[in-house]
Design a protein with these regions (language model features):
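Alpha/beta enzyme core
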Residues: 1-172
């Protein structure tokens, strides 16, 4: 984090490259950096190929939103304070801008991503559909803790049936 509270893109990307190489060396078939740093997919792809891991695939978290749906997880692991006053909104996606999502996904594909993630999934099914239709790459949606918490609260209140809603929510 710099003095203005921003995550340092280039330094973070260097760490992500080291992590991806470590996973590939350990035998991972797919690496999936859970971040939104600019240029990280190209750097990871280059490092993997230079190290001979030409078959290691990359799942890019291309559309990772600055979402309140992460709240229960961040509270559970105490990660809200990790940024020391920083804000993930300065590098995660604006929920109101679907065109930015398509642009970011396209950049990651051009840099070498084999598949992409939209996170969280449920509130952004419009993004999932556009990515799949317009960019035609394997597309995954991530159900985060806030989505689970909504379902669990409704189940506990008797508004939804647990098995049915869990199965329905995973059909994306």
């Amino acid at each position: 984090i710099d003095e203005d509270g921003y995550v340092m893109n280039d330094e973070t990307t260097e760490v992500l490259v080291k992590q991806a190489l470590s996973h590939a060396e350990a035998g991972a078939d797919v690496v999936a950096p859970s971040d939104m740093m600019d240029g990280r997919i190209g750097k990871i792809r280059e490092a993997l190929e230079n190290a001979g891991y030409i078959h290691t695939q990359i799942m890019a978290y291309s559309a990772k939103y600055a979402s309140n749906y992460y709240g229960p997880f961040r509270d559970a692991v105490g990660s809200s304070s990790n940024l020391k006053g920083g804000n993930k909104k300065n590098y995660q996606m604006d929920p109101a801008n679907i065109d930015e999502a398509i642009h970011e996904v396209a950049l990651d594909i051009n840099e070498g991503a084999d598949m992409v993630m939209v996170k969280p999934g449920m509130p952004y099914l419009d993004v999932v559909r556009r990515v799949k239709t317009e960019l035609q790459v394997p597309t995954f949606a991530y159900q985060v803790s806030g989505e689970y918490a909504m379902h669990k609260a409704a189940i506990m209140n008797g508004w939804l049936k647990e098995r049915e809603i869990v199965m329905e929510s995973l059909l994306c």
